[in-house]
């Protein structure tokens, strides 16, 4: 049973639809697996806002998920899921 609930933003859902089906399924499974203890698997992005940090999670070799974690309500917001060369543009 996972401690954190996972919510996908519309952008993340769109990103998953653009990925090949097998890659998208692996990404969803990997994100579900970290919901018990997400801080063991993620890296805080250096340029993110200290009050609302953004984290990077390596889903596969070349696929990254950008996450925002809200500890007060135990929710992981998945912001983006993209190839790593595209995922850091907006953050």
Where are the language model's segments positioned?
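Generic hydrophobic secondary-structure packing signal
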Residues: 8, 23-26
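Alpha-helix boundary/capping and short turn/kink residues
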Residues: 21-24, 39
């Amino acid at each position: 049973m996972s401690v954190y609930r996972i919510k996908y933003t519309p952008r993340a859902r769109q990103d998953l639809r653009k990925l090949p089906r097998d890659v998208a399924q692996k990404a969803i499974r990997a994100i579900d697996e970290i919901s018990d203890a997400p801080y063991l698997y993620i890296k805080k992005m250096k340029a993110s806002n200290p009050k609302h940090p953004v984290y990077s999670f390596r889903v596969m070799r070349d696929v990254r998920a950008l996450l925002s974690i809200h500890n007060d309500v135990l929710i992981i917001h998945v912001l983006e899921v993209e190839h790593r060369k595209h995922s850091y543009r907006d953050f």
